[in-house]
A protein has these predicted regions:
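Histidine-dependent nucleotide/RNA phosphoesterase domain, centered on the 2H-phosphoesterase fold
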Residues: 1-169
């Protein structure tokens, strides 16, 4: 079987997507770029990359042993990332529970010979790609989102770009 492109993420519920959509609507009108379909909004925890299909059940079982603390993020601004040319919704701070979850996932992935990225973890939700440069936009009303769990996600390429879907056990 071929490899699949995977990552761990905090997947947004329909209610969370609607809340963000309503909050971002007035802000996104000032952003030039391709707005990401809200059905694909997520917070990446750890990028895995190409992963053997036959190993996925073992990865799911190993990740299933992790019991994360509840995670709460307060998103309060829209930032532009120059190198990636994306508009990202950013939280005010990174809670210890989120840092602990990322470390646990990275440790779990070591058993599968997946090395953690060597860069600072910055939780975010990408809301536009191929964006033009803009100044940071503070949200008039910060948005608090909470998660009790995380998902193993697959990135599936299609004619209109990548789409994301959770892989359920």
């Amino acid at each position: 079987m071929p490899d699949r492109r995977l990552f761990f993420a905090l997947w947004l519920s329909d209610r969370q997507r609607e809340l963000l959509r309503d909050t971002l609507r007035p802000v996104l009108t000032s952003v030039e770029g391709a707005v990401v379909d809200r059905r694909d909004w997520h917070v990446t925890l750890v990028f895995i990359g190409a992963f053997p299909d036959e190993q996925i059940p073992f990865l799911q079982a190993a990740a299933g042993e992790i019991e994360p603390e509840p995670i709460r993020l307060r998103f309060d601004r829209l930032d532009f990332w120059q190198r990636a040319k994306v508009a990202t919704l950013m939280p005010r701070a990174v809670p210890p529970a989120l840092e602990a979850l990322v470390r646990s996932l990275e440790k779990t992935l070591e058993a599968f010979d997946v090395k953690a990225e060597d860069r600072l973890y910055r939780p975010h939700i990408t809301v536009a790609r191929r964006a033009r440069n803009f100044e940071t936009v503070p949200l008039t009303r910060p948005v608090d989102l909470e998660w009790q769990d995380f998902d193993l996600m697959e990135s599936v390429s299609g004619p209109s770009g990548a789409r994301y879907r959770p892989l359920k056990q």
